[in-house]
Each structure stands twice: as structure tokens, then as C-alpha cells.
Amino acid sequence: MSRSDTDGRDTSFASRNGVGGSQLSEPPSQRRERPDYGYAVEETHRPHTAQERFPDSHGQRSAPDLYSRDSDRFSYHRGDTLTPAQERSYQRELELMKARGEQERSYGGASASRSSRPLEADHHYGGMPLTRGLVDDFAPEPMASSGRPNLEGFSRVENGRRYRLVVVQHPSRARMCGFGDKDRRPLSPTLIVKLIITEEATGEEISPCEVNTSLFLLATDLCHPDDLMLAPRNILVHHHASSLSSNPIQHGGAGGYATDEFGHRSGSSLGNFAADGGGPCDDGYRSSTHPQHASESTGAAALPLSSSSMNPYDRSPHASSSIQFGGGGNFAQQSQAESYTRNLVGAAVASASVLKDEQDKWCTFFVFQDISVRTEGVYRIKLMFVNLEVSGRVGTGVADALAETYTDAFTVYSPRRFPGMLDPTPLSRKLASQGIKIPVRNDKKKQRRRNDEGGDGMGDYDGASGGDEDDE
């Protein structure tokens, strides 16, 4: 802005407040020399800011200034003629003040006391005030209690029939079987589950003889005894780390390929792949390559190597390693391998058996007489029932769970702390007499064997699949 424009504004300001001469043609330099020249008594002697000299428009003002009631930024005199821009700014200010008053009357002055954290009344979405959960950082709603698994499980209806699982015999103890391939330590007592099918309309129980149970399956899984939302306890992770330092073998070939001790390129040292090269082979019973037969040429990048699992039983090995080169030509091979082992071993999935119970009533039973736990601890067993003969889904490989339940918590002991197997229950004896292989002792045979000179009374079980009397 030029000096002449500034002098003109000062002239207008002085004449408006009644100070100085009334002749507008008086030069500003002569007017400043008069003793009565100056500010009014009620005015504060301070320099004019840019905003006071040139009132900014609505879009250039900050948000708090829009709601300032005592601001003198838009104080106009009634006798003055307003420019079109000033008139529009004045109208906007009036509209904002009216809207502010309406908001305070509607919400009880909640926005008068503003804090660093906004209130619910200040947040709107589609004309409706937001809830506290959405205002607070728009956090997701917590999972409903109905979505969490509970010990009661669930029961579903399929084709007008409701399927429900009832654990008629809970295991209470077991001896850990360790990581051997053939060692089995059955649960005591044997886990027995009954399936009940009822008509949804009438609630009448359907006889197992009227139902095709050939495709009924019941799957088991280990879980935490208290918190069912924790990670399943059926997977054991083993970490194996090794470090090997040796001298590399120099070859004249191109870098980037793994070569064996005879100088030939070997693609198998990069991993165990199928014959077509499409992906890694997932055969858990076949060992992979030998890292000591692979080496890297000078200047090659670090390539992954695979290692075999220590025990192929029920394991899916995943290994990775890298080769690090040193300044002196030596390199150190450091590998980190992980192998996964099932903690629940044996026949973890059982098919249905239509048998008579203690009252000679036909029922659908699932018997788990050949499952063991590798490590000691406290567990629950999760039971999920599926019917593979669902109409319209046969052969798809996918089946929905129709029922679910959990056993009571049981303890798996170490060999030194195991208190021994419990006596067979009447239900176990009843099912064993119908051909189910449940380890049930026959006291008469055991006594007759002990009286025999050549016998030691070991391993006398009806239904015959093995128990362990050494534990008692």
C-alpha cells in the first residue's frame, strides 16, 4: 500500500471520531503538526494491524473468530455507507450468530464450555448426534457376548432336525505320551459322546435306527481350560537353530547358483520341490536336502536352504536359513528351523456307532478310546459334529458344524506324578461288550492269569486294544 492511501485512511479515521479539523482537503503533514491531533480518549493507543486495516472475508477468518460475539471486527456505523463486500460480510456474521444461538438453545449450552476433547453434542452424522463409542476415536464396537464361544456350545437345525451333543463320560486324567511314534496313553475314563437328534417342530427324539449315521463325524481339538478364545493347544512349535562355519568352494561358473561338491548345479539345494517345479513338496515323511553338500560361489546372494524335520510323525517342517559371507572369504551358515507337532495324537476324529446304553436303549455314540496328549497340563477337548450327507453339498469337501460342546477340564500328568488309571465305568463295560475297543480289565481273567505259573496277569482287556497296567 502506498503512503497516500495510508494518509487517506488516517484522515477518514480522525474525522469519524471527531478529532482534528473537519477539512478533508488539509494535507496530512500539516494536520499531524496540530496539538489536538491524536486518538480519542476511549481509544487504546496501539498500532493498527493488518486485519484491522483491511477486514478479511469470511473464508479467510479462522474458525474461532466466527463464533466470537464481542469481536469489534465488524462494528459498522449506521450513518456510513457500506460497500457490497462489507454488506455481504455483515450478513454472514448475523447468520452465524443466529445459528450459534439456535445451537446453544437446542443443546442446553453444551458447546459454550469447550474442552480439548469434543462432546457428543458437537458431533453429528446425518443430523443425528453420535454415540460416545463413535466419538472416542471411532473405536470398533466390542464383540458381542453371544459371539464368544461358551462351554455350552451350540446346537443347529438342518432339514427340520436339531442336532445336539451330550458328553456322557468326561475324562479326568491321563498320562503324557511324550514325543514317541508308537507310545499311546489313553484318557481315563474313555471319552464318550452321545448325539441326540430331535424334530424341531415337535421336539420328539428321533431313533438312531431311522437315521443314516454312516457319514456322521465328530472331530476333537485341545483348548485352554478357562479362556476358549486363546490359541488352540493342539500345536507345539519347535525351534531349531544351528551355525556352521567353513570355507567356500570356488567355482568358475556364474554366481547365483548352488553347486554340489562335484561342481554341478543343484536346484534341490534351494528347497524340496515337486517334480513339476510348481511348489514345495508337502510330504512330511520325506527328508529334504543336506546343507553340507551345498555351497555358494563368490559374489552370490543369500539363498534359502531347507532342513529336514527331526521326527516325521505328525509334523509339518518349515525351515529357513541364510548364508553370510565374511571379509576373509569364510562364511557362516545360520539356520532357523521350525517344526510343528500335534499335541493331541491318535484317532482324533471318530465315526458314529449305534449301540445300546446301560438301559438297553439304542443311541448314537462317539467313542474316543485311542487319543493321547503329548505334554502335561490342564486341557479341555472341543467337540464338533458334522454331517457329510447334507443335501446339495455332497462331494464339495466343505461341511458346516451342526453341534459343538466341550468336555470338563482334565489333567495330563508326567510319568512320575501320574496317579494311575481309573476303574472302568459301567458304560465303558457295556460298550466294550458290544465290540467297541475300550481298555476294560476283566478281573476273572486277570486272577486266573496270575494263578497260572507262566502268566503275569498283564494286559487282560476285553475289547482288546491295549491299556497300561504298569501305571497302577
From Swiss-Prot:
<protein>
    <recommendedName>
        <fullName>Velvet complex subunit umv2</fullName>
    </recommendedName>
</protein>
<dbReference type="InterPro" id="IPR021740">
    <property type="entry name" value="Velvet"/>
</dbReference>
<feature type="compositionally biased region" description="Basic and acidic residues">
    <location>
        <begin position="89"/>
        <end position="105"/>
    </location>
</feature>
<dbReference type="GO" id="GO:0005992">
    <property type="term" value="P:trehalose biosynthetic process"/>
</dbReference>
<comment type="subunit">
    <text>Component of the heterotrimeric velvet complex composed of laeA, veA and velB; VeA acting as a bridging protein between laeA and velB. Forms a heterodimeric complex with vosA; the formation of the velB-vosA complex is light-dependent.</text>
</comment>
<keyword id="KW-0805">Transcription regulation</keyword>
<dbReference type="InterPro" id="IPR037525">
    <property type="entry name" value="Velvet_dom"/>
</dbReference>
<comment type="function">
    <text>Component of the velvet transcription factor complex that controls sexual/asexual developmental ratio in response to light, promoting sexual development in the darkness while stimulating asexual sporulation under illumination. The velvet complex acts as a global regulator for secondary metabolite gene expression. Component of the velB-VosA heterodimeric complex that plays a dual role in activating genes associated with spore maturation and repressing certain development-associated genes.</text>
</comment>
<feature type="compositionally biased region" description="Polar residues">
    <location>
        <begin position="286"/>
        <end position="298"/>
    </location>
</feature>
<comment type="similarity">
    <text>Belongs to the velvet family. VelB subfamily.</text>
</comment>
<dbReference type="GO" id="GO:0030435">
    <property type="term" value="P:sporulation resulting in formation of a cellular spore"/>
</dbReference>
<keyword id="KW-0804">Transcription</keyword>
<keyword id="KW-0963">Cytoplasm</keyword>
<dbReference type="InterPro" id="IPR038491">
    <property type="entry name" value="Velvet_dom_sf"/>
</dbReference>
<feature type="compositionally biased region" description="Basic and acidic residues">
    <location>
        <begin position="29"/>
        <end position="59"/>
    </location>
</feature>
<dbReference type="GO" id="GO:0005737">
    <property type="term" value="C:cytoplasm"/>
</dbReference>
<feature type="compositionally biased region" description="Gly residues">
    <location>
        <begin position="456"/>
        <end position="466"/>
    </location>
</feature>
<dbReference type="Pfam" id="PF11754">
    <property type="entry name" value="Velvet"/>
</dbReference>
<dbReference type="GO" id="GO:0005634">
    <property type="term" value="C:nucleus"/>
</dbReference>
<feature type="region of interest" description="Disordered">
    <location>
        <begin position="433"/>
        <end position="472"/>
    </location>
</feature>
<feature type="region of interest" description="Disordered">
    <location>
        <begin position="281"/>
        <end position="327"/>
    </location>
</feature>
<keyword id="KW-0749">Sporulation</keyword>
<keyword id="KW-0539">Nucleus</keyword>
<feature type="compositionally biased region" description="Basic and acidic residues">
    <location>
        <begin position="67"/>
        <end position="80"/>
    </location>
</feature>
<feature type="domain" description="Velvet">
    <location>
        <begin position="158"/>
        <end position="441"/>
    </location>
</feature>
<feature type="compositionally biased region" description="Low complexity">
    <location>
        <begin position="106"/>
        <end position="116"/>
    </location>
</feature>
<keyword id="KW-0843">Virulence</keyword>
<feature type="region of interest" description="Disordered">
    <location>
        <begin position="1"/>
        <end position="121"/>
    </location>
</feature>
<feature type="compositionally biased region" description="Basic and acidic residues">
    <location>
        <begin position="1"/>
        <end position="10"/>
    </location>
</feature>
